[in-house]
Curated annotation (Swiss-Prot):
Family: Belongs to the MurCDEF family.
Enzymatic class: ligase
Gene label: murC
Compartments, as annotated in UniProt: Cytoplasm
Pfam families: Mur_ligase, Mur_ligase_C, Mur_ligase_M
Reactions performed catalytically: UDP-N-acetyl-alpha-D-muramate + L-alanine + ATP = UDP-N-acetyl-alpha-D-muramoyl-L-alanine + ADP + phosphate + H(+)
GO MF term (any one): ATP binding
Keywords recorded for this protein, A-Z: ATP-binding, Cell cycle, Cell division, Cell shape, Cell wall biogenesis/degradation, Cytoplasm, Ligase, Nucleotide-binding, Peptidoglycan synthesis
Name listed for the protein in its UniProt record: UDP-N-acetylmuramate--L-alanine ligase
Metabolic or biological pathway: Cell wall biogenesis; peptidoglycan biosynthesis
Residues the entry annotates as binding ATP: 124-130
Main location: cytoplasm
Length: 487
């Protein structure tokens, strides 16, 4: 792949344009009136939106697409790929044969980042999308007119990207494939660092190495010292002037801390401290320590760019969240259905803790409220690498439903499956059931859910596509069945 993408007017073609990361870049470039095309094997609302904005969309990934784009053109289009696109892809092969410049999606984001003097890159193993959305929303509410690129859809700007006219860019910076090292932001935020993406990394040291290089590229760093890896390995890498820290404990030496945390109702109320001095009260329509930490990162960014705390608090009070990040899809007959992207053991634990708070609030209305976790494991490599950790991640669930593994394109090694994972979880949990297919899951939930249940759909695959049918079922059916005890 080549290294210098041209954003000055040459046509650009995205292979796999329907993906959340690729489509955000396509949206930004379309707003610049660049000739944009893309292909995706599965049409979705994202590709339809891009097409309505002027992009040429191919519904199949075929070599003829590249040939068509090259016809009558003085120069072949630049071709953008994500890590999910392999060299055996017919469009990729045709692009090579046609002499098209080929770039990774991170090359486009890196080029965009260099155009914004106040670029803000949000990195970290967990919490990137929510934190990016919070920071973007904060700057938007403060009339700073940011350009925003996130890995989720946000109602406030109607999608996963927004084009602004100011020097501010807020971008989610992905570490999953090592491309994090290409970014040189003015402000770098690191929420936490853990081993994940075992298809790319084999050790935490490899992950740390990528983040260390990213740190060297940041003018100013904002980091959570609640993360042991950051506290142990990163605090000595920057001077006090270039590193800003935050923590959920007022007893920790950090620039931004909190105290008097109150998880009440459907949100969080907390007092925010800046270098030991109270800034005031922050109210969030979000639950859970992880979301509070994400919001504190946004506070730190806001203060760094010169916002007064009352303006920050006013903005964050109305943040409505991002899709698939503890997204309350709907409620029927007292059953609350929540969609969440969590697919790593640590993410599952903190998300279930939030669901437990939600269930405690529901218990005021219903005689009993349970947390029901429906988990679709994502990738064989992740299930195998974190097998033991997954088995111990569901303690806050009253009922656990496990499906077969969503491969995400990985070959089945034949050594790991959803049933083995369900059995391992059952060794540490009293009520676990394995329902291999999504149809099985629908049938099971229709017969076992009851009023007061908080149902959390966990995973980065396609589990969430069953939620609309379940919601419709409970909206039109009679009262839910009483609990059936699993044996």
């Amino acid at each position: 792949m080549q290294s210098a993408v041209d954003l000055g007017g040459r046509p650009i073609h995205f292979i796999g344009v329907g993906g959340i990361g690729m489509s955000a870049l396509a949206h930004i470039l379309l707003k610049r009136q660049l000739p944009i095309s893309g292909s995706d094997a599965r049409a979705n609302h994202i590709t339809q939106k891009l097409e309505s904005q002027g992009a040429q969309i191919f519904s199949r990934q075929e070599a003829t697409n590249i040939k068509q784009l090259c016809q009558g053109s003085s120069a072949p289009p630049q071709v953008i790929c994500s890590t999910a696109i392999h060299e055996d892809n017919p469009e990729y092969q045709a692009a090579v044969q046609a002499g098209c410049p080929i770039f990774h999606r991170s090359d486009v984001l890196a080029a965009l980042m260099q155009e914004f003097p106040q670029s803000i890159a949000i990195a970290g193993t967990h919490g990137k999308t929510t934190t990016s959305s919070l920071v973007g929303y904060l700057l938007l509410q403060a009339s700073l007119d940011p350009t925003i690129i996130v890995g989720g859809e946000v109602a406030a700007w109607g999608g996963n990207a927004r084009t602004g006219e100011s020097p501010y860019l807020v971008a989610e910076a992905d570490e999953s494939d090592g491309s994090l090292v290409k970014f040189f932001p003015h402000i770098g935020v690191i929420t936490n660092i853990e081993l994940d993406h075992p298809d790319h990394y084999t050790s935490l040291d490899q992950v740390v190495s990528i983040f260390q290089e990213f740190v060297d590229h940041c003018h100013t760093l904002i980091v959570s010292v609640d993360c042991p890896t950051i506290a142990d390995r990163f605090l000595a890498l920057a001077t006090d002037q270039s590193m800003i820290t935050y923590s959920l404990s007022s007893k920790v030496s950090a620039d931004y801390t909190v105290q008097n945390i109150d998880y009440s109702g459907q949100g969080t109320i907390v007092e925010v401290l800046e270098r030991g001095e109270s800034l005031g009260q922050l109210e969030l329509p979000l639950l859970g320590e992880h979301n509070l930490s994400n919001a504190l990162a946004a506070v730190a960014v806001g203060r760094y760019v010169g916002l007064e705390f009352p303006a920050i608090a006013k903005a964050l009070r109305t943040f409505s969240g991002a899709k698939r990040r503890f997204e309350i899809y709907g409620e029927a007959q007292g059953i609350c259905l929540i969609d969440d992207y969590a697919h790593h053991p640590s993410e599952i634990q903190v998300t279930l803790a939030s669901a437990k708070l939600q269930a405690q609030a529901a218990a005021a209305t219903y005689s009993q409220s349970r947390v029901v976790a429906v988990f679709q494991p994502h990738r064989y490599s992740r299930a195998a690498t974190f097998f033991q950790e997954f088995s111990q991640s569901f303690q806050d669930a009253d009922l656990v439903v496990v499906t077969d593994i969503y491969s995400a394109g990985e070959a089945n090694p034949g050594t790991i499956n959803g049933k083995k994972l369900a059995d391992a979880i059952a060794a540490n949990h009293s009520v676990v059931t394995f329902q291999p297919t999504l149809t099985n899951v629908i049938d099971f939930l229709q017969g076992h859910l009851q009023s007061g249940d908080v149902v959390l759909f966990l995973g980065a695959g396609d589990l969430n596509r069953i939620i609309p049918d379940l919601l419709t079922h409970f909206q039109v059916s009679s009262k839910p069945s009483p609990e059936v005890v699993l044996k």
